[in-house]
A protein has these predicted regions:
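Periplasmic-binding protein-like
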Residues: 19-27, 92, 96-139, 157-167
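Bilobed "Venus flytrap"/periplasmic-binding protein-like clamshell domains
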Residues: 22-78, 92-93
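Ligand-binding clefts/hinges and TM-proximal coupling segments of bilobed small-molecule sensing domains
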Residues: 53-70, 107-108, 138-167
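Acidic, polar ligand-binding/catalytic clefts
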Residues: 1-38, 106-112
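Short active-site oxyanion
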Residues: 42-46, 85, 136-137
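A ligand-binding cleft/hinge motif common to bilobed small-molecule-binding domains
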Residues: 1-11, 56-60, 81-113
């Protein structure tokens, strides 16, 4: 699956979304920050890996906090755990996986954005049949509950199936 992004949509014909994943923050356990909205405050330093979809979103939307961009997730985690950043931005599943390396951290409830994922086919030189097929396939997989069951069966934390469309 691919993150459905406007920048990619020029070259990729996306299916409807199948799943969504939350982006949130890790903060030190003793932080006074208890809500996602409290992170965008003067003096708060947010560590994020550069060029991640959520980093691009935060670059557009953060008004008061300072983003500190690192080359990759390991560097962003190190900046948070060893160099005193006030928050670490990331996708909830990745942050959950990283929590054992960050024993003095906790995740905030809620999210600052969600990322929808779907299937895609190249736009260039296509007749649209592939995109039409993907749309029908994804609609059926979501409506039948297959996506939700697969997420549950495989124990994927932080990932959710999108709600089926109402007829």
């Amino acid at each position: 699956t691919l993150a459905i992004e406007q920048a990619r949509a020029a070259k990729i014909a996306f299916s409807p979304p199948m799943t969504e994943i939350e982006a949130t923050y890790a903060v030190p356990k003793d932080s006074k920050i208890t809500k996602v909205a409290e992170v965008d405050a003067p003096g708060i330093r947010i560590s994020v890996p550069e060029k991640a979809g959520y980093e691009l979103y935060l670059t557009r939307t953060i008004k008061n906090a300072t983003l500190i961009k690192s080359k990759g997730t390991p560097a962003a985690v190190e900046l948070f755990t060893k160099k005193g950043a006030d928050a670490l931005g990331g996708l909830r599943p990745a942050l959950l996986d990283t929590l054992p390396q960050m024993p003095d951290a906790r995740l905030l409830e809620g999210n600052f954005m969600t990322v929808n994922h779907g299937l895609g086919t190249p736009r260039a030189g296509r007749t649209g049949a592939g995109a039409d097929y993907l749309k029908a396939f994804v609609d059926e997989m979501v409506a039948s509950g297959f996506i939700a069951r697969s997420i549950e069966k495989n124990g994927v934390k932080g990932l959710a199936a999108v709600a089926p469309k109402k007829p």
